[in-house]
């Protein structure tokens, strides 16, 4: 499927190294209206057929390499490590991909599936806007109509990405209901898909939603861990000790973790949006205060109010501001294979500024949450520890938001 110049093996989508979690025992499922059962069955059938098809595999490989810009580098950040009294720290540079984040890995694959199915239109939700930008770019490249649903709150704080989506030829639909955030954008996209599924593909941006989406997104994002597993050998003769990634829906994290899941010596850490602190009630830390429930067609941990309805969520990072989390993360949380924690807005902002000033790399606010956890644990780690943080996206999209925040603080 995907052959990177530095990797010793191909990304074979018919081989699932995380097979323990392929058929999820507790979470996942397909909780959808009857109108969507057949379209989802068709999607699963098409994907299972295509991932074994030589032409599809070659096309996907060509686009990943020559359009998306894979492989992405593994960068050791010595200045950052010294500043936090830390161990050997590396960044997996998904921020250097075309469109600025890991999202492009998944949308290219899903758009190719949609074209094989004869569909001419793709729709999606987006929070931070990175998924919307990636899908708009992929749709333009592959000659498809594209509609992006985005909560009004996120449109206001992610204007640069909204402008990029429109420049790329896609339509942006503002969703003005409820919390006007990512959950509401997903609701609107699903409604569109229900009525137009005959010619439309719903391109979910994270490893969640009804089956088979979690499987498909995980497989397309697993190119991240495939590359890391090979690239770290340039620096050491062993696997890393710890992997850290931010977790909104969880696609960058599950792709980053995937090829390391069988090696239980590698510690896997997902970092959620802690907002103003869990005690404040204004956060998106699903594993900290959420409980199992069903939302958007799948079963996982969900932030709920006392009546069992979806609670309002909050994070300075639009990409982490979601009420639930991918079902594979729920399984790994309960099995203990991965640890999940959170970082607050202030901690993420501190990490954002520190990496920018010490390494000349501006991280996305989403990725800054993972960096914040790295800062928090760094002094407690042995100096020969090898830690890798997935830099899932770049922070250009967040600059105006952060500058405005700084101005308000100065005048308060």
From Swiss-Prot:
The modification N6-(pyridoxal phosphate)lysine is found at residue 103. The keyword Transport does not apply. Pathway: Amino-acid biosynthesis; L-tryptophan biosynthesis; L-tryptophan from chorismate: step 5/5. Keywords: Amino-acid biosynthesis, Aromatic amino acid biosynthesis, Lyase, Pyridoxal phosphate, Tryptophan biosynthesis. It catalyses: (1S,2R)-1-C-(indol-3-yl)glycerol 3-phosphate + L-serine = D-glyceraldehyde 3-phosphate + L-tryptophan + H2O. Its cofactor is pyridoxal 5'-phosphate. One of its GO terms (cellular component) is cytoplasm. Gene3D superfamilies: 3.40.50.1100. One of its GO terms (molecular function) is tryptophan synthase activity. The keyword Lyase applies. PANTHER family: TRYPTOPHAN SYNTHASE, TRYPTOPHAN SYNTHASE-RELATED. Tetramer of two alpha and two beta chains. This is Tryptophan synthase beta chain 1.
């Amino acid at each position: 499927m995907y052959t990177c110049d530095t990797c010793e093996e191909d990304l074979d989508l018919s081989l699932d190294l995380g097979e323990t979690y392929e058929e999820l025992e507790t979470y996942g499922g397909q909780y959808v209206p009857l109108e969507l059962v057949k379209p989802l069955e068709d999607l699963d059938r098409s994907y299972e057929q295509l991932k074994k098809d030589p032409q599809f595999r070659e096309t996907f490989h060509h686009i990943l390499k020559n359009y998306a810009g894979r492989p992405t580098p593994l960068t050791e950040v010595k200045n950052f490590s010294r500043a936090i009294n830390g161990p050997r720290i590396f960044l997996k540079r998904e921020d250097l991909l075309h469109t600025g984040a890991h999202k492009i890995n998944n949308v290219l694959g899903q758009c190719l599936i949609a074209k094989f199915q004869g569909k001419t239109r793709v729709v999606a939700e987006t929070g931070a806007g990175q998924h919307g930008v990636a899908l708009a770019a992929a749709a333009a490249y592959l000659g498809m109509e594209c509609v992006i649903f985005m909560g009004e709150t996120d449109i206001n704080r992610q204007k640069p990405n909204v402008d990029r989506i429109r420049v790329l030829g896609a339509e942006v639909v503002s969703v003005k209901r409820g919390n006007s955030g990512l959950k509401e954008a997903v609701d609107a996209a699903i409604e569109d898909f229900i009525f137009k599924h005959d010619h439309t593909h719903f391109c979910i941006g994270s490893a969640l939603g009804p089956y088979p989406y979690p499987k498909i997104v995980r497989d397309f994002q697993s190119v991240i861990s495939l590359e890391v597993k090979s690239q770290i050998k340039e620096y050491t003769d062993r696997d890393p000790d710890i992997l850290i990634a931010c977790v909104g829906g969880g696609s960058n994290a599950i792709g980053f973790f995937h090829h390391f899941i069988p090696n239980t010596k590698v510690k896997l850490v997902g970092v959620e949006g802690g907002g103003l602190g869990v005690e404040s009630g204004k956060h998106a830390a699903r594993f900290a205060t959420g409980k199992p429930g069903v939302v958007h067609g799948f079963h996982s941990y969900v932030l709920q109010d006392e009546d069992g309805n979806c609670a309002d969520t909050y994070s300075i990072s639009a990409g982490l501001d979601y009420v639930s989390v991918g079902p594979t993360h729920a399984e790994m949380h309960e099995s203990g294979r991965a640890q999940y924690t959170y970082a607050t807005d202030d901690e993420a902002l501190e990490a954002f500024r520190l990496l920018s000033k010490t390494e000349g790399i501006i991280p996305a606010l989403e990725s800054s949450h993972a960096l914040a956890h790295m800062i928090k644990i760094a002094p407690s780690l042995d100096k020969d520890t090898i830690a890798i943080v997935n830099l899932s996206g770049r922070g250009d999209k967040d600059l105006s938001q952060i500058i405005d925040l700084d101005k308000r603080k100065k005048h308060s």
